[in-house]
A protein has these predicted regions:
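Ferredoxin-type iron-sulfur electron-transfer modules in oxidoreductases and energy-metabolism complexes
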Residues: 17, 35-56, 73-99, 144-163, ...
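Conserved phosphate/anionic-ligand binding catalytic regions in large, soluble enzymes, centered on
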Residues: 28-30, 64, 142, 161-183, ...
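Short amphipathic, charge-patterned alpha-helical segments
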Residues: 44, 221-223, 371-388
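Flexible inter-domain linker/hinge segments
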Residues: 101-163, 326-338
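Hydrophobic alpha-helical positions that pack around
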Residues: 118, 246-372, 384
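Gly-rich Lys/Arg/Thr-decorated short loops/hinges at beta-loop-alpha junctions or inter-strand turns
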Residues: 129-144, 193-207, 310-315, 357-362
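Accessory "access/gating" subregions that flank catalytic or transport cores
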Residues: 147-187, 344, 349, 357, ...
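Histidine-anchored nucleotide/phosphate-binding helix
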Residues: 214-228
């Protein structure tokens, strides 16, 4: 006799897979409310029938859209932005978790023209992954460069970096491979690798975004450098104004140690290397490599005379690699893909990509990573969208507070080291600060001298005293006191600072001053600002009044 089956059918619904939502943890996004948006999303979806996995990723670099919320869909990640906490309820009602339509919907993020036109090499993972997730890092190509490097003799690693054409991204543009070989050729047993993360130039934020958005990449680059030159210890020197970057790098180092990416016998290779974070005290001069080394040693940040260079006698008198964040962060990609793949990007002696940072009076500020050779006009118009104020662009300062002011007639310059040097300018760290037609260029020239006088370490007279005299002379010029004579004095002073200063602090301060006088001379032909009225005119700001 057959017993009837009385088991009730299973009518329970299987648990739904969580929907992945991304909200940046980058400090720029946090400054405009990303944390509150993340909290609102978690609160609104808690206990719902659609489980949500919230990932705090880095920023994509489209800063005018922050906080940028992304939702993973079968078609790809759909973006919404800029999102405020008050928008969350409406977004969820409109089907946010399915990529639904809404006025803030931007479409598939990877297809947005701002991103689609770029060559993201160094920034390939930033904004895509959870910065402190080792699984994310490995899933997106992490450690490929280090594993390749560890299979090669140190000399071949240096050859690969040299053949790639990688130059220092901190401003000087010195070939990275040459610096590495100099350190490797030193016989000292104790050597160091130092990452200069004292990003103090106005309008620059790429180093911060790397540290906050892809810290393992930077650790990987430092470890490759250590293998190449025989170093066992390295330091990050991070400016105190970057607390989020400091916290992220410290957390990443601890995680790397637990996964044997740092410490003894790294990945079974026999390499021993460890990293430490040191926080600067806020001095701009410590962005200069020898001042940074002085600060790392616990001393006041002052410039060291050269020679000897740090590659021969650096930290604690030992051979030391000092490279910028972007330089070291690019090394893993070069080792993973090969020197030729990187060398094929760019133009002339400027190979690979540069991370341009658009700031100042600009409609769409953010990160643009593209091959060298793009023009300044393309960056300003195609990416930046003109000024935030809606007024015409009058000038752009490229390369930080010591960079030249470029007029509209030079906006078709290709963005590469040689073209800028020929034009009397420099690329620097890739920062662009935009000014509209209301800017007073005499005031900007004065500011360059004033900035130098405040930030000078004081070690050399041309910088320490010359910058103070520069402020005084410019004040006399715009006040109408013996203009021609004082312009001649200013020119002589600029020559003295350029030729006599110990470092680029005093040596480059004349660059913005001279460019302002050369390209915007009308701004120096008006009476002083005391009691005067500024009015806009087609060429810039004029000061009305009698002389």
């Amino acid at each position: 006799m057959t017993t009837p089956d009385t088991t009730a059918p299973d009518t329970t619904t299987p648990p739904k897979s969580p929907v992945t939502v991304y909200v940046p943890r980058d400090s720029a996004a946090r400054s405009v409310g990303a944390d509150a948006v993340a909290d609102a999303l978690l609160s609104a979806t808690a206990g719902g029938d659609r489980p949500v996995e919230l990932v705090r990723n880095g920023s994509r670099g489209m800063l005018w859209l922050e906080p940028l919320v992304e939702v993973a869909t079968p078609e790809g990640r759909v973006g919404y932005g800029p999102v405020a906490p008050s928008d969350v309820a409406d977004l969820l009602a409109a089907g946010l978790l399915d990529g639904g339509d809404h006025p803030l919907r931007l479409g598939l993020v990877e297809e947005l023209p701002w991103l689609a036109r770029q060559n993201r090499v160094t920034f390939a993972r930033i904004g895509v992954t959870d910065p402190l997730s080792t699984e994310d890092y490995l899933r997106h190509g992490g450690l490929e460069g280090l594993r390749t490097a560890l299979r090669l003799p140190p000399a071949e690693v240096i050859d690969t970096v040299t053949e790639s054409g990688l130059r220092g991204r901190g401003g000087a543009g010195f070939p990275a491979g040459v610096k590495w070989k100099t350190v490797a050729d030193c016989a000292d047993e104790l050597k160091f690798v130092c990452c200069n993360a004292d990003e103090g130039d106005s309008g620059t934020f790429a180093d911060r975004m790397v540290m906050e958005g892809d810290p393992f990449m930077l650790i990987e680059g430092m470890t490759i450098a250590a293998h190449a030159v025989g170093a066992r210890e390295g330091y990050f020197y991070i400016r105190s104004e970057y607390p989020d970057a400091v916290a992220t790098m410290r957390a990443a180092i601890e995680i790397a140690r637990t996964h044997n990416w740092l410490g003894e016998d790294i990945l079974g290779s026999g390499l021993t290397f460890d990293l430490h974070v040191r926080v600067g005290a806020g001095a701009y001069i410590c962005g200069e490599e020898t001042s940074m080394l002085e600060s790392l040693e616990g001393k006041r940040g002052t410039v060291r005379p050269k020679p000897p260079i740090p590659a021969v006698e650096g930290l604690f008198g030992k051979p030391t690699i000092v490279n910028n964040v972007l330089t070291l962060a690019t090394v893993p990609v070069i080792l993973a893909r090969g020197a030729r793949a990187y060398q094929e990007l760019g133009t002339g002696r400027s190979r690979g990509t540069q991370v341009f940072q658009l700031g100042g009076n600009i409609a769409r500020g953010g990160i643009v990573e593209t091959a060298f050779g793009i023009t300044l006009r393309e960056l300003l118009e195609d990416y930046g969208g003109g000024t935030f104020s809606g007024r015409p662009v009058r000038t752009v300062q490229v390369g930080g507070p010591l960079g030249a002011y470029l007029p509209e007639s030079q906006f078709d310059l290709p963005m590469d080291y040689e073209a800028f040097a020929e034009a009397g300018a420099m690329l620097g760290h890739g920062g662009l600060v935009v000014f509209d037609d209301t800017v007073d260029m005499a005031a900007q020239a004065r500011f360059a001298m004033e900035f130098c006088s405040v930030e000078s370490c004081g070690k050399c007279t041309p910088c320490r005293i010359g910058s103070v005299r520069g402020v005084e002379v410019i004040d006399r010029i715009v006040a109408g006191e013996d203009r021609d004579d004082n312009l001649a004095v200013l020119e002589d002073l600029c020559d003295l600072m350029t030729d006599g200063s110990l470092c680029a602090m005093g040596g480059l301060t004349p660059m913005p001053v001279r460019s302002a006088i050369t390209h915007f001379s009308d701004d120096f032909l008006v009476r002083g600002t005391r009691g005067a009225v500024h009015t806009a005119h087609p060429g810039g700001t004029r000061t009305e009044g009698t002389t």
